[in-house]
Each structure stands twice: as structure tokens, then as C-alpha cells.
UniProtKB/Swiss-Prot annotation:
Gene Ontology MF term list: mRNA binding; structural constituent of ribosome
Keyword Magnesium appears in the UniProt entry: no
GO biological process, one term: translation
Name listed for the protein in its UniProt record: Large ribosomal subunit protein bL12
Subunit annotation: Homodimer. Part of the ribosomal stalk of the 50S ribosomal subunit. Forms a multimeric L10(L12)X complex, where L10 forms an elongated spine to which 2 to 4 L12 dimers bind in a sequential fashion. Binds GTP-bound translation factors.
Key words, A-Z: Ribonucleoprotein, Ribosomal protein
């Protein structure tokens, strides 16, 4: 039996079409009794656990718009400034309150965003 190096395998895979790669994956799954989908499904679970650990440390905060208040137009302007959204998207976000405006930001940023939104007339919560 001839020994094939990893480099030779990688080169062979690089030269394959998408259809050929799909067939190869199916054949490997059948040959070894595994599923490529199981690996993909396991990856987000690990990411979710890492996110849970970060939330416990409280280094990341979410800015949540509870209510736009009476000055809805001013709040929409501030939401656009903070998020970089277009006018339509910012309006939809404000109309769907309570809603997270920014997620996973530092405490300082969260407090700045909260101050801007409250100055515009909104009711805001930082979690």
C-alpha cells in the first residue's frame, strides 16, 4: 500500500469540484459510520457555553430600549447613531420596544448609550 502524505491529500481536495467533494463526504460518512452534520451541530453548543461564561463575569452588557417615550423621532435618531441602522430599520427597532439596541458592549459604552437614549426621552435598561 502506498503512503499518501497529508499535503497530497490537501492538493487532491483543492482540485475537486463542489459536487465531487459532496460525494467524497458521503462516501467517508458511510465508510467510517460518522456524520459531518454532527460536528457542525456541536460547534454552536460550545460557543453558547463560552457566551454563558462571559455573561457570568459581567464584562459585556446589553442596552435595552424599554420605551421610546414621547420624543420618538429623537430616539430614532439616537438609535440610528448608535447602531448604524437605516431610518426604516431604526424606526422598526424603536417601534418593537422593549428591544435590545446594543448587545455585548462594555460597561462604559452601555452607560454612554443609555445616557444618550435617556436624553432623547427613552426609557432604557442596561443588563
Amino acid at each position: 500500500m502506498a503512503t499518501i502524505s497529508k499535503e497530497e491529500i490537501k492538493e487532491a481536495i483543492k482540485n475537486m469540484t463542489v459536487l465531487e467533494l459532496a460525494e467524497l463526504v458521503k462516501e467517508l460518512e458511510e465508510e467510517f459510520g460518522v456524520s459531518a452534520a454532527a460536528m457542525v451541530a456541536a460547534a454552536p453548543a460550545a460557543g453558547g457555553a463560552a457566551a454563558g461564561a462571559a455573561a457570568e463575569e459581567k464584562t459585556e452588557f446589553d442596552v435595552i430600549l424599554q420605551s421610546p417615550g414621547d420624543k420618538k423621532i429623537n430616539v430614532i435618531k439616537v438609535v440610528r447613531e448608535i447602531t448604524g441602522l437605516g431610518l426604516k430599520e431604526a424606526k422598526e427597532l424603536v417601534d418593537s420596544a422593549p428591544k435590545a439596541i446594543k448587545e455585548g458592549v462594555s460597561k462604559e459604552e452601555a452607560e454612554q448609550f443609555k445616557a444618550k437614549l435617556e436624553e432623547a426621552g427613552a426609557t432604557v435598561e442596561v443588563k
